[in-house]
Amino acid sequence: MQKKVTIYTDGACSGNPGKGGWGALLMFGSVKRELSGYSPATTNNRMELMAAIQALEALKEPCEVALYSDSSYLVNAINKGWLKRWTSNNWKTAAKKPVENIDLWKMILELIRLHSVTFHKVKGHSDNEFNNRCDYLATQAIKNNR
């Protein structure tokens, strides 16, 4: 039986594009682990994806994951089938334009094949303490350039 892990993620950007940061909170039972990172030149969407990637990569074995994000871009791509359509359309959108951030989407595809992941949308900058913590981690990563 796989371990059940809850993950919250958030990405932030100072300017879009601009300096970016991401934050993640992984929870397994009573254990909590915080992760964050920085990029000197990026976009908000890339940081949202990177938060999910880094959190899933931090898992040491295949897990059952509930991943919570305030990013409609991330959650809708999975839950509304956009990612599946993009891959079957040779990485083209419904408008026949190239999908942005293909490198990161390919990483997410690999990770969701390894783990059993369900994606959940949460309201950003609201009263969700875990999402707010990830936002803090992401903005601090930008502030501290690391």
From Swiss-Prot:
Residues holding Mg(2+) 1: 10, 48, 70
Residues holding Mg(2+) 2: 10, 135
A GO molecular-function descriptor: RNA-DNA hybrid ribonuclease activity
Record's cofactor remark: Binds 1 Mg(2+) ion per subunit. May bind a second metal ion at a regulatory site, or after substrate binding.
Documented EC number(s): 3.1.26.4
Keyword terms: Cytoplasm, Endonuclease, Hydrolase, Magnesium, Metal-binding, Nuclease
Recorded catalytic activity of this chain's protein: Endonucleolytic cleavage to 5'-phosphomonoester
Gene3D superfamilies: Ribonuclease H-like superfamily/Ribonuclease H
GO cellular component: cytoplasm
Residue stretches making up the RNase H type-1 domain: 1-143
Cofactor: Mg(2+)
Localization, UniProt: Cytoplasm
PANTHER family: RIBONUCLEASE H1
Quaternary structure, from the entry: Monomer.
Biological role stated in the UniProt entry: Endonuclease that specifically degrades the RNA of RNA-DNA hybrids.
Family: Belongs to the RNase H family.
Protein name as annotated: Ribonuclease H
Species whose genome carries this gene: Chlorobium phaeobacteroides (strain BS1)
Classification lineage: Bacteria, Pseudomonadati, Chlorobiota, Chlorobiia, Chlorobiales
Gene: rnhA
